[in-house]
Amino acid sequence: MNRLKEKYNKEISPALMTKFNYDSVMQVPKIEKIVINMGVGDAVQNAKAIDSAVEELTFIAGQKPVVTRAKKSIAGFRLREGMPIGAKVTLRGERMYDFLDKLISVSLPRVRDFRGISKKSFDGRGNYTLGIKEQLIFPEIDYDKVTKVRGMDIVIVTTANSDEEARELLTQVGMPFQK
């Protein structure tokens, strides 16, 4: 079993139960899924850009991402409906815990001038969004093979009812929030 999942079951869940006075274990918020999205705006001109983004996301997440396509045409961006414009991957279960563990303990500390992540990125429903400016912070990405530095969005979806509950859950898991 993953060490983060073990920690959740043994320490975090009972701590949250006492803090928020839940009656049942099923009320305790837990992490449902993690969605990693990488927008590839230059895929409009360069078709190979989407392939490199898909390859990088596969290395980072450990599973093959889905190519996202444009919903409508936008003339200003020279974009047609159905053109590939990004890639996303949804992690659940064991892979989700592995990725979160790697993100907290290895990748985030590698960010330049890292002082913690923002406390304000909650959406009001207990989900947290984290923007990453470069994919090079992940150990799986080989610096020499990177054609272009790309950022990505990481959304952590929880079953929490409020931002306060979700913040407490993520703090207990070990997310390095700003003081």
Swiss-Prot record:
A Pfam family it matches: Ribosomal_L5
Alphabetical UniProt keywords: Ribonucleoprotein, Ribosomal protein, RNA-binding, rRNA-binding, tRNA-binding
GO BP annotations listed: translation
One function term, GO molecular function aspect: rRNA binding
Coiled coil: none
Superkingdom of source: Bacteria
Quaternary structure annotation from Swiss-Prot or TrEMBL: Part of the 50S ribosomal subunit; part of the 5S rRNA/L5/L18/L25 subcomplex. Contacts the 5S rRNA and the P site tRNA. Forms a bridge to the 30S subunit in the 70S ribosome.
Name the record gives this protein: Large ribosomal subunit protein uL5
Organism: Bacillus velezensis (strain DSM 23117 / BGSC 10A6 / LMG 26770 / FZB42)
Lineage: Bacteria, Bacillati, Bacillota, Bacilli, Bacillales
Encoding gene (name): rplE
